[in-house]
């Protein structure tokens, strides 16, 4: 989206959206032509099997208090990313950056940093363990968010913004990997799909 908004400064405003639509068509066509896997067990699940039992299993494994704490962690662990996301572009514009700068430079930096962070997040979990990685990710995101205050009090500086965006996206990439591993560790094999869906909805 940021890239398309950047192109909007150079080309007609509607052209980037045509480009986005064309790219989305590739995925849609691939989805339509991909054969569906065969499922030999086509039995309709009851409400108890589909919803109540997975919740009961989760509470039983962790007890009510621990389950409540875990759900609170799940609900708030990526809260800053979720809140910051929609505010990013308006913030950059208010700070004096053009749509071209946001789309062609900042968003590219963010993409590269996120990919590196996702990769290193897996290495961090392997070396430090899941729970230490959770703490590291939380502090990294907290610090990277605070860095945006420097942008708010400074003159428009694309190099400074790129460094801070890189740091923020890198931290978010690590947190993304760690968060997925954390959620995976909470679900049981019997109710994997339902419990994972419920946890990611928080």
Whereabouts are the PLM-identified features?
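Intracellular juxtamembrane helix-capping segments at the cytosolic ends
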Residues: 174-188
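Short amphipathic helix-loop junctions that connect adjacent transmembrane helices
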Residues: 86-103
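C-terminal membrane-cytosol helix-exit motif in multi-pass small-molecule transporters
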Residues: 22-40
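Helix-to-loop junctions at the C-terminal end of transmembrane segments
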Residues: 116-131
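C-terminal ends and interior cores of transmembrane alpha-helices
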Residues: 139-156
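Loop-to-transmembrane helix entry/capping segments in MFS-fold secondary transporters
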Residues: 99-100, 189-199
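Single conserved hydrophobic/aromatic residue that forms the stacking wall/gate
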Residues: 1-11
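Juxtamembrane intracellular "pre-TM" segments in multi-pass secondary transporters
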Residues: 39-69
